[in-house]
Curated annotation (Swiss-Prot):
InterPro entries: Ribosomal_uL11, Ribosomal_uL11_bac-typ, Ribosomal_uL11_C, Ribosomal_uL11_C_sf, Ribosomal_uL11_CS, Ribosomal_uL11_N, Ribosomal_uL11_N_sf. It comes from Persephonella marina (strain DSM 14350 / EX-H1). One or more lysine residues are methylated. It comes from the Bacteria. This is Large ribosomal subunit protein uL11. Transmembrane segments: none annotated.
Length: 145
């Protein structure tokens, strides 16, 4: 018989930097999860990632207070900011351009994000990422709108 799910928690935590402090502690504490056990397993699972990379995680909590978690790929906006070398997107993306990314950088990001996007086609994934870039005020070189 399958375990009974009592809740799912979605958090964005920097890789290798999970700690019992907010937002992790209170979110897990509400469901009675062993916080230190999660922190240790999350930090171990993100050991290969660059420290500080924001990683979305979906934690499934069961009735016996056990849990499982799934690591997602970093948000497209985070990857685009890294590629363009900027701190934040434009406040007015239509008028203000804050950085540039090439078609090759868009392809790399699309390949990373592929498993979380709702497409199997790399070209469609590139268009999704390019749209995110445009909405952040990042200019995309070599890719038609």
């Amino acid at each position: 018989m399958a375990k009974k799910v009592v809740g799912t928690i979605e958090l964005m935590i920097p890789a290798q930097q999970a700690s019992p402090s907010p937002p992790v502690g209170p979110a897990l504490g509400q469901h009675g999860v062993n916080i230190m056990e999660f922190v240790k397993s999350f930090n171990a699972a993100t050991a290969e990632m660059k420290p500080g990379t924001v990683v979305p995680v979906v934690i499934t909590v069961y009735a016996d207070r056990s849990f499982t978690f799934i690591l997602k790929t970093p948000p497209a906006s985070y990857l685009l900011k890294e590629a363009a070398g900027i701190k934040k997107g434009a406040s007015d993306p239509k008028r203000e351009k804050v950085g540039k990314v090439t078609k090759e950088q868009i392809r790399e990001i699309a390949e990373i994000k592929m498993k979380d996007l709702n497409t199997e086609d790399i070209e469609a994934a590139m268009r999704i990422i390019a749209g995110t870039a445009r909405s952040m005020g990042i200019e995309v070189e070599g890719l038609e709108a």
